[in-house]
């Protein structure tokens, strides 16, 4: 009997030991898998051709996006994203350019993100992220008025909402599963990079000259903030929470407008027929931004709303200097115009929703007051964006017959102040990681606004995206 008991005890101990070893082995294997360097990315080919005139090429981009993600320990990780691109068309103007491969075959390398994240830093509820990072704020779809920490990447004007990463320190403190607070410090602000190619002048304001003057030449200089804590720093904080299925946040940013203002124009006569040259000084205004957003779902319908109050720290004044026309005047001859009044904050906001139907179709609708480049209450326009798409053949084929926007710049004279953007699209998933997209975009309207200025750029677009 004792022998049977001892054998039973030994068997139980052996089985328990085996189970523990198996569990330890599984944990070790899982930990090893999590600590492995994860490499992912995509290859993107993006070509566009104009539909008018001689069908000139409008865009040519071949991009490899490479992402590295490694969890070094259970309390830290490294992440980076790098773009290697062949972008644009050769701009060869002389035989000397043929000796420069960067001109014959233009390419660039861009570090989009590169940071280290530490979990449980100093206290178990605090995470810190240091390095170049994309800090995304806001609940709206791509167009977020509260997303103001990172500079806009406006290179492709049709890629709404794209930003560059910033060198920053970001801390997240988690009160519990529902509430957290984020603080961000960016030591030096960066301006937005402007559109390129045929879109280069899309955001440039229309220049109104005094009667009788003809512009012969234009030049400008940029006055960047000094690189010190007082001038170049950007900082912000955001309280985020969830209450009864509603995600919300309140935020504040002490930053700079990423698009410059023309603060001084010097007019110089060049002939007796009214021809002039203009030299402009451009600078970046300091701005306080108070934001709020929310998102929820009701009966399967997604809703979101987002708003930002922009408060200029000082009046933004443009000075036109006509002293060159009056060489005998003992004092400068200037005229000032108020571009932004610090006592009159302005609000940009977005409201929208989306819904997935049982038949595989999807609809997305947004209304936005104030686009990226618009500043001041009297300059904010209204934008309606709509997209409807439907999937077929187990989601391999996606057709979006309705897509685009309707823009109103003056409701009192809407017939002469509107724009229409129509962008139908068809995409096909050839494999699980390869998608081909064909689309066209048409612009029309009257007046003076961003999309009316692109009326001559109706285009056909081809994209191939291969993910790995």
Where are these regions (language model features)?
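Transmembrane beta-strand segments of Gram-negative outer membrane beta-barrel proteins
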Residues: 26-52, 76-80, 399
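Repeated loop/turn-to-beta-strand initiation elements of outer-membrane beta-barrel proteins
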Residues: 37, 74-78, 124-128, 178-181, ...
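Transmembrane beta-strands of outer-membrane beta-barrel pores
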Residues: 45-51, 84-88, 132-136, 185-189, ...
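Residues on the lipid-exposed face of transmembrane beta-strands in outer-membrane beta-barrel proteins
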Residues: 66-70, 113-118, 169-173, 237-241, ...
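Outer membrane beta-barrel
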Residues: 69-201, 244, 445
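Signature for the C-terminal beta-barrel architecture of outer-membrane proteins
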Residues: 125, 159-363, 367-376
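Outer-membrane beta-barrel "beta-signal"
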Residues: 454-468
